Amino acid sequence: MTAPALITFAPDQAGEAVFDHPAEARRVSGNPQRVTLPFYTDALGEFDAGEWTCEPGAWRIAFGAHRQEFFSVIEGRIRISDPEGNASEFGPGDACVIPAGFEGVFEVVEPVRKHFVMFERKATA
């Protein structure tokens, strides 16, 4: 049996870039372009890893009960605020987990590039 190959974040290993903007109903400020470079998705479609870049702007986020994210900022600066207004800032070298059920505001203060791992458990019957 052959072991699965390691997944690196080398530029030539990325999938096709996905360009989007926050939904209008969620926007707080700006209309930033977001670019997601996927590097890995598991066979069940529950676990994704990649690189994400974004222009300055802010939008509301609401993670479902089964969705969570780990990220590590490579460059730029972001701020995440909870509904009570408590804010945390992250810059190069900082990392964070956004837990399942989190709601708040995600703000890109300076153009940002981060690595991310997203896990979203699929509903079971």
Whereabouts are the PLM-identified features?
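Short, charged/polar surface micro-motifs in flexible loops or helix N-caps
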Residues: 44-47, 55-59, 77, 122
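Conserved short histidine dyad/triad with adjacent acidic residue
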Residues: 48-65, 99-100
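Well-ordered beta-strand positions in beta-sheet-rich domains
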Residues: 51, 87-89, 103-105
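Short hydrophobic/aromatic-rich beta-strand segments that constitute the beta-sheet cores
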Residues: 61, 80, 114-116
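Short, conserved beta-strand element in jelly-roll/cupin
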Residues: 64-80
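Short acidic-glycine-tyrosine-enriched beta hairpin
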Residues: 84-100
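Ligand-binding loop in jelly-roll beta-barrel domains
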Residues: 92, 100-123
